[in-house]
Amino acid sequence: MVAIPRLARLSVPAWALSARGRFYATVSTPQTLVEKIVQKYAVGLSEGVKVRAGDYVMIKPEHVMTHDNTGPVISKFLSLSCSKLDNPRQPVFALDHDVQNQSETNQKKYKKIQAFAKEHGVDFYPAGRGIGHQIIVEEGYAWPGKMVVASDSHSNHYGGVGCLGTAIVRTDAAGIWATGKFWWQIPRIVSVSLDGRLSPGVTGKDVIVALAGLFNKDEVLNAAIEFTGSGVEHLSIDERLTIANMTTEWGAVAGVFPVDDKLKEWYQGILRKAELRKFISPTVPSTVGAKVHPRLNAARLDDAMTNRVVADPGAHYAARLSLDLSTLVPHVSGPNSVKVATALPKLLDPPIPINKAYLVSCTNSRASDIASAAQVLRGKKVAPGVEFYIAAASSRVQEDAEAAGDWQTLIDAGAKTLPAGCGPCIGLGVGLLEKGEVGISATNRNYKGRMGSPDAIAYLASPAVVAASAAKGVICGPESMDLSQLPQYEQPKFSIIKEGAAGEEKPVEVDEASLEPLLEGFPAYFEGPLLFAPQDNLTTDGMYPGKYTYQDDITPERQAEVVMENYDPTFAATARELRTALPTASSPSTLPGAILLSGYNFGTGSSREQAATAIKNAGIPLVICGSFGDIFKRNSINNGLILIESPSLIKDMTERFAKDGVRNKGGKDGKLTVVPEGWRIKVDSQRGLVTVNMGEEEEKTYPAAKVGRSVQELWVNGGLEGFIRASL
């Protein structure tokens, strides 16, 4: 064990500069594409500071989109005593989820949202105009080199056009309406190289289905992906949008493609269409009276292409994955899991009968997808006993498909049309899977119960495979597909290289003068005894049982009594003992409290806020893990619970205290929660150091992410709601 003295300059190994262990950033350090885009939208940074993966930053995004959930966001916004939007041009409302629902209740909700948009001058797209993500792209809100967020998990979609898109929660959306900004921890960044060229009949959908199936061990969980490689230029923009869209299912929080000449040509086509359509139909406030479209215009495109945002040579990535596109054949995802991907030829014998087929969603229902399905079904009929549902990604898409004759081709084949919107993809409206049925869909999720009955089976595939299956009644490829001409590989060629290994011992000096001062009122140190839960994927239900979730009158004290009940029934009592025995703080700048340690993906599962507040109410001000579930992270920091990632510390704790030296088996002492006697932890908020004192003589210091200024702002104001009120 080595103690690190307090010196003016510290020497640390290069591995400590990983996404979770960076001490500081110099101006000369190369940045990734994601880091560069975030740099443009980060506010409140000290002069000369370059953002890095792992940093907590305050972001002022270009736009924030909400859909049917705009209603609850309005309620949250008004509950904060907000009367006006910080910037009416920033939000975009697009009603797209429950568009088939003509009930009085739903129509009243939609009218309320429209009235709010009109009152505040927000761009509003009514039900039937299309899926929000498609609108954000085709109306130019998402733009190369920009950052756009939405209160929907498929915001990754915008990465298909070189725009950093990521999901936020509803409270964040209300905060952006009020203040123009939200906090974000820049995730670890993974490079995915797509090499070679797809064979005829293989599509972008096959690429992402294969990636999610091949790399199914959480290689990109909660990461931001940057796509590179020689194969990118051969992918159409629609294919890139499909791939970026489904990086969500792969586990990533963003997936961004580079800006290239193919994207420029695509946008030139979009601009021509916008001009032909007079761009202001339907009218939205941002275009009223404009002679030139405020987003879709040649000058803006020229600027984006001339000043392309690209990664610096030598930029650091947490891992590098690669897939040889030339070795890929059509793939099918499922049943009922995106982590299971099978080459289409392997599913042909014995045949798998289907009951329903779907060409809907923001993933694969653009004009090129509809054309692909129409080519397969031209002159054919949907098989007897099969229902084939189609819905365009937007009304603009449907107009294009109708003009090309493709929409009518599908109708003539027996397809049943639905309005432009989400529909069956999210289990709303007509045509859902019934008990015992099998469906194949060009959508993005096939989780059990997602598209109907939990007793149904769902597969995902490309539009051509979906259409061919609808015509034949079994899962199959188009008749034009010659299997003998496809790449003859048992599986595609792929690889993974992890960077930042602990074996790299290049010393890096850290200058104390580069450290940013902490906000007044934020603790310089967190210090106290530790509790170790040696468990990966500890769910929010384990932290706070569902049976308490809707007890709205439950007190903070009661939350503390049931915290971690489903994981360890003795946890609450253990935490209480530590809380009552806390010594006096070693200095006025130190916040005393027990500190919880656990494994990876801590807080996976449902979005219940009480999982975070129960831990905080149990006297635990800070949690240290290998990684956190993204929504849990947002809920925690929004409620003043500090989270720190330190994989090296968790590794040592696991080896020393977990049964058999691995997590998920409890502790060596037979307990689910380990409390090492006499051990204490001290977290240095400013430097990103975690010092573990193992008694009077021994201690060891670990690198961790520093507590960023954005998190400090929320904490000193008592959480997100207090921060918003203080900002008004």
Swiss-Prot record:
What PROSITE patterns does this protein map onto?
A: ACONITASE_1, ACONITASE_2
Is Transit peptide tagged as a keyword?
yes
Is Iron-sulfur set as a keyword in this record? Answer: yes
Major place of residence:
mitochondrion
Q: Which UniProt keywords apply?
A: Amino-acid biosynthesis, Iron, Iron-sulfur, Lyase, Lysine biosynthesis, Metal-binding, Mitochondrion, Transit peptide
Q: Name one GO biological process term.
A: lysine biosynthetic process via aminoadipic acid
Q: Which Pfam families match?
A: Aconitase, Aconitase_C
What SUPFAM superfamilies is this protein classified in? Aconitase iron-sulfur domain, LeuD/IlvD-like
Write down the required cofactor(s): [4Fe-4S] cluster
Output the InterPro entries linked to this UniProt entry: Acnase/IPM_dHydase_lsu_aba_1/3, Acoase/IPM_deHydtase_lsu_aba, Aconitase/3IPM_dehydase_swvl, Aconitase_4Fe-4S_BS, Aconitase_4Fe-4S_dom, AconitaseA/IPMdHydase_ssu_swvl, Homoaconitase_mito, IPM_dehydratase_rel_enz
Its UniProt pathway annotation is: Amino-acid biosynthesis; L-lysine biosynthesis via AAA pathway; L-alpha-aminoadipate from 2-oxoglutarate: step 3/5
Annotated residues for binding of [4Fe-4S] cluster: C362, C422, C425
Catalyzed chemical reaction(s): (2R,3S)-homoisocitrate = cis-homoaconitate + H2O
First-tier enzyme category under EC: lyase
As for subcellular location, the record says: Mitochondrion
UniProt GO cellular component terms:
mitochondrial matrix
Presequence range in chain numbering: 1-24
Q: Could you give the cofactor binding note from the entry?
A: Binds 1 [4Fe-4S] cluster per subunit.
Q: What family does this belong to? A: Belongs to the aconitase/IPM isomerase family.
NCBIfam families recorded for this chain? h_aconitase
Task: Say what the protein does.
Answer: Catalyzes the reversible hydration of cis-homoaconitate to (2R,3S)-homoisocitrate, a step in the alpha-aminoadipate pathway for lysine biosynthesis.
The name this protein carries in UniProt is: Homoaconitase, mitochondrial
Name the source organism.
Answer: Cryptococcus neoformans var. neoformans serotype D (strain B-3501A)
What gene name does this entry carry?
LYS4
